[in-house]
Amino acid sequence: MWQAKKSLIEDACKAAENYYPDEFLCFFGGNKEKEIITEIVMLPSYNSEESASISEAVLPIDDTIIGCFHSHPNGNNKPSQEDKKFFKKYFINAIASSPFNAENTAFYSQKGEKITIKLV
């Protein structure tokens, strides 16, 4: 089962709150074999009320990026079809909805299936 520090997820949610009403996008660093998220990775992205996107050219070339986190300011933390396409690139994916906190953050697999993670 994937795990992460609750404070790390809360930090990502705080950043999402700061971008509101625009969507916010960041990435998770960690260890895919141990299924642990260890850091938030901030990279230059384009943010708007409708979407958040990033140029693949700015992503690290190694395997330290294991997941993504983004916000849905509309209060819905379910993935869109575009989200599901994006999820295929990462082992773990998160969507936070307003109000932004760990409790309103849903986690998804590469297949777009909702999963439970352990917050420690």
What are these regions (language model features)?
Residues 1-65, 74-120:
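Conserved beta-strand-loop surface patch within small alpha/beta domains used
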